[in-house]
Curated annotation (Swiss-Prot):
Signal peptide: 1-32
Record-marked site positions (Cleavage): R324, S325
Full protein name: Pre-small/secreted glycoprotein
Name of the gene encoding the protein in the UniProt record: GP
A Pfam family this chain is assigned to: Filo_glycop
Record GO biological process: monoatomic ion transmembrane transport
GO cellular component: extracellular region; host cell membrane
């Protein structure tokens, strides 16, 4: 796979046995254990479908926790839109869970928000919580806001992914990516699954993981953070700014920054200079490069994978392949939801499997 991602697949083909394999999404709700990642009532194509759906779980050593980024599902990643998915809430204790491997993120975020009186809005990161390590662009936002109290949670129930730790809250000055935690069930325990080397080692191979990926930090200034009157400015230098719009891609902002410097359009006085971009300017550059890298699509897919099978009517099968671990999924409705739900909430029923004469039979407990 080279250095294009963290997750490395075993090269040998997996043994075909049974279909009792699932990607289990960890969600911090105690009343149900959801299964699968859903966007707009459609499942998303992922490499996970291609290699985890061929075997059964026989040992907890086969479970591997992986962080999956929301941006692969097509969420808007611009700062004005992304920050609307987060909000302050009091009386809810934060939760942290660790994960073993993750994706490369195109967009990460770093917040440093204060109240008008100078007090901090966000808590300091606990010991051991570090920046998300694989970010192409880090959107660093600093400024002020009313911060009504409590901690900053994700309104849609997702996690904030840090370096091998996922939290339900945002920490001050610590880079994160939005995502969820999934458990992969591997065909068998493999110690080298997440550490297998690339097929072709680079000539200048180094042990520093950060050297594999170039990170660009984009700075913003915000006023009235978290309110209906929030105003964002893209920061060129300490006196030169650009009025931020949701249509601006990271690639456009990088080019805009270079243009302002090369054309000598920065503030040449002691006063603040704020530019506004002409509405006719095309700002969509770079988006397709991102999607080609993620290898995902916003369109529904019809691949017969173990996740997409959840939406098909159950067929009559032998005992070895009868799906006893799932209850029927609720029918899809066209009613608009106020907030998106990233999880398909299907209750999970525990089952016990026995192997006799090379045949596996499973029954619910």
């Amino acid at each position: 796979m080279g250095a294009s991602g963290i997750l490395q697949l075993p090269r040998e083909r997996f043994r075909k046995t049974s279909f009792f394999v699932w990607v289990i999404i960890l969600f911090h709700k105690v009343f149900s254990i959801p299964l699968g990642v859903v966007h707009n009532n459609t499942l998303q194509v992922s490499d996970i479908d291609k290699f985890v759906c061929r075997d059964k779980l026989s040992s907890t050593s086969q479970l591997k926790s992986v962080g999956l980024n929301l941006e692969g599902n097509g969420v808007a990643t611009d700062v004005p839109t992304a920050t609307k998915r987060w909000g302050f809430r009091a009386g809810v204790p934060p939760k942290v869970v660790n994960y073993e491997a993750g994706e490369w993120a195109e967009n990460c975020y770093n917040l440093a928000i204060k109240k008008v009186d100078g007090s901090e809005c966000l808590p300091e990161a606990p010991e051991g919580v570090r920046d998300f390590p694989r970010c192409r662009y880090v959107h660093k936002v600093s400024g002020t806001g009313p911060c009504p109290g409590g901690l900053a949670f994700h309104k849609e129930g997702a996690f904030f992914l840090y370096d091998r730790l996922a939290s339900t809250i945002i920490y001050r000055g610590t880079t994160f990516a939005e995502g969820v935690i999934a458990f992969l069930i591997l065909p068998k325990a493999r110690k080298d699954f997440f550490q297998s080397p690339p097929l072709h080692e680079p000539a200048n191979m180094t042990t520093d993981p950060s050297s594999y990926y170039h990170t660009t930090t984009i700075n913003y200034v915000v006023d009235n953070f978290g309110t209906n009157t929030t105003e964002f400015l893209f920061q060129v230098d300490h006196l030169t700014y650009v009025q931020l719009e949701a249509r601006f891609t990271p690639q456009f902002l990088v080019l805009l920054n270079e243009t302002i410097y090369s054309d000598n359009r920065r503030s040449n006085t002691t006063g603040k200079l704020i530019w506004k971009i002409n509405p006719t300017v095309d700002t969509s550059m770079g988006e397709w490069a991102f999607w080609e890298n993620k290898k995902t699509s916003q369109k529904p897919f019809q691949v017969k994978s173990c996740l997409s099978y959840l939406y098909q009517k159950p067929r009559t099968r032998s005992l070895t392949r009868q799906r006893r671990s799932l209850l029927p999924s609720p029918p899809t409705t066209t009613q608009a939801k106020t907030t998106k739900n990233w999880f398909q909430r299907i209750p999970l029923q525990w089952f016990r499997c026995k192997t006799s004469r090379e045949r596996t039979q499973c029954q619910p407990q």
